[in-house]
Amino acid sequence: MENMRSENFNQGVSMEGVKHAPEMANTNRRALRDIKNIIGAPHQHMAVSKRGLLDKPAAKNQAGHRPMTRKFAATLANQPSSAPLAPIGSERQKRTADSAFHGPADMECTKITSDDLPLPMMSEMDEVMGSELKEIEMEDIEEAAPDIDSCDANNSLAVVEYVDEIYSFYRRSEGLSCVSPNYMLSQNDINEKMRGILIDWLIEVHYKLELLDETLFLTVNIIDRFLARENVVRKKLQLVGVTAMLLACKYEEVSVPVVEDLILICDRAYTRTDILEMERMIVNTLQFDMSVPTPYCFMRRFLKAAQSDKKLELMSFFIIELSLVEYEMLKFQPSMLAAAAIYTAQCTINGFKSWNKCCELHTKYSEEQLMECSKMMVELHQKAGHGKLTGVHRKYSTFRYGCAAKSEPAVFLLKSVAL
C-alpha cells in the first residue's frame, strides 16, 4: 500500500477517468444556435441529456479522493500540465455553461442574421391580410364613379345630396314609360311612317314656338303611350299631336301657348272643342301620369359626366332628335338613347371612338352595349338631309344650333361594328 502511495506521489494523480469540461460539453450539450434556441425559430423535437457533470457516475479507473497536503500540492505544481484539471463544484458548473454557450474553440461558428430567421406566423398573416385589403381598396377606387357634382355643392337647386337617388329612381321607372316597339300593329288606319311625319312636323312647331327641350321629349312620349292604348283614325292624328304638345307645355313650360295659336298652327283643321275633348281623353287614358323619365332627363346628367362643351351638347341633341322621328328606335330605353347619342356625338366630333371610364360609370353602359344603338344613329345622321323628313336637319343647320347637322357622320363606327 505504501508503495502504491509513493508511486502516485511520483507520477501524479491519474486523470484517465475524468473528462475535461470542454470535451464533455461537446458531447452532452449543443450550442444554442444548433438547437434553435432562438426566438421565432421553428420547434424541433430533440432528446437532450440534462444531467450535469456532477451527476455522472465516476469512471472505473478514477482515483479516490485524498487530502491535499503541502507535499502533494508542491508535486502538482512542479509537474508539467498535460491536461487541465476538471473544475470542482460551482466553478465546474460555471465553466460548463460557458463552454456550452460559446462552444469549443475549434468548432466552426455560423453567424445568423435576422434575414436568415423564418418570419413569425403572425407577421406573415399580417402581410397577406394587408395585401388583400390593398387589393380590395384598389377595386373600390376603380369601381367608384367620379364625383361630378362638387361644382354644384353650394347650389341648392342642384340637390346634390339627392341626385344619385333621383337618377336611380329614373333608371328603375324608365321601363314603365316605354312602349312596345310593335304597337303600330294594333293600329288600323295609321302606321309608323305617319308617326314619323307627325313628329317631324311637331319638331318644327317646337322650334317656332321656342319651347323648352324637355317639352319636345315629353310630347313624343305622350303620343306614343296614347297610340299604344287607343286606336286613332288618320284625320285625328294631328289633333293628337298638338294636344300632346299642349299637355307637355302645361307640365314643363312657364308660359303655355293658348289654344287659339294651336288652332292656327293646324290651319283651323280643328276647333277649340276638339282640342279640349282630346285633352280630356288623353289624360284619362294615361291616368294623368305625366311625370315620366324621358331621354332628356338622362341627357343632362350624362352630358355632365362627359364634361361636355356647347359643341358636344348640340351634336348630342341633334342625334337624339333624329332618333325621336324614327319608329324603330323605340326598342331602346331612354337612358340607352341618351348615352348612345352622347357616345356617337363624341365619335363624330373627335373622329375616333371616345368613351371614358367616367361616362361608363355614370351611364352604366359600356362601349360594346352602346354600339348597336350608335350604329343606327350614324345611319340616321347619314340620311338626315335627304328624303321628306328633314325638319331636324334644317333646325340644326342654323347658326343658333351650331350647324351641327353639317358635320360628317362617324361612318367608321359602321365598319367597326361590321368586323
UniProtKB/Swiss-Prot annotation:
Entry keyword Cell division: yes
Record GO biological process: cell division; G1/S transition of mitotic cell cycle
Regions that span the bilayer: none
One GO cellular component term: cyclin-dependent protein kinase holoenzyme complex
Keyword Nucleus appears in the UniProt entry: yes
Region feature (Disordered): 79-116
Compartment list: Nucleus
A GO MF label: cyclin-dependent protein serine/threonine kinase regulator activity
Subunit and partners: Interacts with CDKB2-1, MRS2-F and MRS2-G.
Annotated family: Belongs to the cyclin family. Cyclin AB subfamily.
Protein name as annotated: Cyclin-B2-2
Biological source species: Oryza sativa subsp. japonica
